[in-house]
UniProtKB/Swiss-Prot annotation:
Belongs to the UPF0352 family. It comes from Actinobacillus pleuropneumoniae serotype 3 (strain JL03). This is UPF0352 protein APJL_0577. Pfam families: DUF1414.
């Protein structure tokens, strides 16, 4: 999703691979996968970002990055 990252590709690829493997292990359909990932994002923001304004700004940035990643280039 991100065009630039402060994380190494190896670290990102390993984490992404693990998350995908879990969803595949549970044979989660698209809607269940999106629900679970959405809940994870919500929990990450609620547990790690102090103010509502910051959470909303990050959620908006995340949403925009997701939408941009779906555009055909």
């Amino acid at each position: 999703m991100a065009t630039q990252s402060k994380y190494q590709s190896k670290q990102f690829d390993a984490l992404s691979g693990d998350l995908i493997a879990i969803l595949e292990k549970h044979k989660a359909p698209v809607d269940l996968s999106l629900m679970a990932l959405g809940n994870m994002v919500t929990n990450i923001l609620l547990e790690n970002v102090q103010t509502e304004a910051q959470r909303l700004a990050l959620a908006e940035a995340f949403s925009n990055a997701l939408k941009n990643s779906l555009k055909i280039k």
